[in-house]
């Protein structure tokens, strides 16, 4: 379990580097100037919340990302939670990135296609593009 915890943090850093590379190559849908992690209070849930990646272009536009380093495929709940947490902010234009070690469930893929403003990236595809 300790290796997975360690690799989770390493994977987050890989995802951030991937987004910077996407930005520099003009392939990122959000032209952000800052990128980092966010921790804060969720008044609806009355508890702490975290977002692995928050990248801001301006006061209206941002990218929200979640990074999952697990042996299970990232499911619909991961995307739904990210969307819910993004609603703590007042950005009008949002794009979501989900990164996963082993890919995504069918439900997650289908919802991402319906939403249009979601990019899914698994580790293998990311490494091929870097």
Whereabouts are the PLM-identified features?
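A cross-kingdom feature that marks ATP-driven nucleic-acid transaction machinery
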Residues: 1-130
């Amino acid at each position: 379990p300790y290796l997975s915890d360690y690799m989770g943090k390493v994977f987050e850093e890989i995802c951030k580097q991937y987004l910077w590379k996407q930005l520099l190559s003009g392939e990122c849908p959000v032209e952000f100037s800052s990128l980092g992690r966010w921790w804060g209070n969720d008044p609806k849930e009355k508890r702490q919340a975290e977002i692995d990646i928050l990248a801001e272009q301006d006061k209206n536009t941002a990218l929200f990302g979640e990074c999952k380093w697990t042996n299970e495929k990232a499911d619909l709940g991961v995307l739904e939670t990210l969307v819910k947490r993004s609603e703590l902010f007042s950005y009008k234009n949002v794009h979501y990135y989900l990164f996963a070690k082993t890919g995504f469930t069918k439900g997650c893929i289908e919802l991402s296609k319906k939403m249009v403003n979601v990019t899914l990236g698994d580790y293998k595809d990311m490494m091929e593009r870097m």
